[in-house]
């Protein structure tokens, strides 16, 4: 369901792209927590996130305090990998706008996803990086926090089953947590995002070819630079 985009050590300065994306998003502050949406009609998404936060606060106050203490933002936007993720540069929980808007997505699910991503933020603040070798353990911890939260709810058998199923997959034999497989899924997700936005297939193919060409040039220049130093 969810995956982190956390990379490297903590930083406090936002990139220009992050600043622009925040600037164009419609947002408000709820109980000290920034919530925003990149959608043109943002109000339904913001209301659902607020309702999910109220659910966490009402049913599991400890989890709510951890969410508030761990995250700076909850941002509803297009997410390339999974239905949500933790974005380190913004200290934000990102929720995919397509999932949030779906009639099949319950408030309990949204609340559970927020608890999951807040756990990613909490672990990173403790110096636990989302490296490949420990990725399945981190996901296991986050899923367990979700499961603990879900136990405070009623009538959520389907959510219990989903979390338990994901928890069973959090092991070192699951190849989906390798860097290679995760980047492949992100590429697939980026293509689906472009299709969702109405981008023609030939443009999508061109974007990926240009990306691969630029990456190849960067690798070549690094090799040349290394040879020059030697």
Question: Language model features by range: what are they?
Answer:
Residues 1-25, 212-230:
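N-terminal low-structure segments adjacent to metalloprotease catalytic domains
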Residues 156-192:
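Acidic/His/Gly-enriched intrinsically disordered linker/tail segments
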Residues 132-168:
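Post-HExxH zinc-binding segment in Zn-dependent metallohydrolases
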Residues 21-92, 151-155:
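Auxiliary, metal-adjacent structural segments of Zn-dependent hydrolase domains
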Residues 112-125:
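Active-site recognition of the HExxH zinc-binding catalytic motif
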Residues 177-230:
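Pan-zinc metallopeptidase signature
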Residues 84, 88, 107-111, 137:
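Anionic, Ser/Thr-rich low-complexity intrinsically disordered regions
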Residues 97-113, 133:
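Short pre-active-site segment immediately N-terminal to the catalytic Zn-binding motif
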């Amino acid at each position: 369901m969810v995956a982190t985009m956390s990379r490297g050590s903590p930083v406090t300065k936002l990139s220009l792209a992050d600043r622009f994306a925040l600037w164009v998003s419609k947002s408000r502050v709820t109980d000290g927590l920034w919530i925003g949406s990149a959608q043109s009609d943002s109000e339904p998404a913001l209301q659902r996130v607020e309702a999910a936060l109220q659910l966490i606060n009402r049913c599991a106050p400890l989890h709510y305090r951890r969410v508030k203490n761990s995250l700076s933002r909850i941002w509803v936007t297009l997410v390339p990998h999974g239905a949500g993720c933790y974005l380190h540069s913004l200290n934000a929980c990102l929720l995919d706008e397509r999932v949030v808007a779906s009639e099949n997505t319950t408030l309990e699910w949204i609340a559970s996803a927020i608890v999951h991503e807040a756990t990613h933020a909490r672990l990173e603040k403790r110096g636990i990086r989302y490296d490949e070798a420990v990725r399945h353990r981190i996901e296991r911890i986050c899923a367990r926090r979700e499961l603990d939260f879900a136990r405070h709810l009623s009538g959520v058998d389907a959510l219990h089953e989903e979390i338990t199923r994901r928890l069973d997959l959090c092991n070192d034999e699951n190849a989906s947590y390798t860097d290679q497989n995760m980047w492949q899924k992100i590429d697939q997700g980026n293509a689906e995002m472009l299709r969702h936005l109405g981008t023609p297939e030939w443009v999508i193919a061109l974007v990926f070819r240009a990306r691969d060409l630029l990456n190849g040039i960067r690798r070549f220049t690094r090799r040349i630079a290394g040879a020059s130093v030697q």
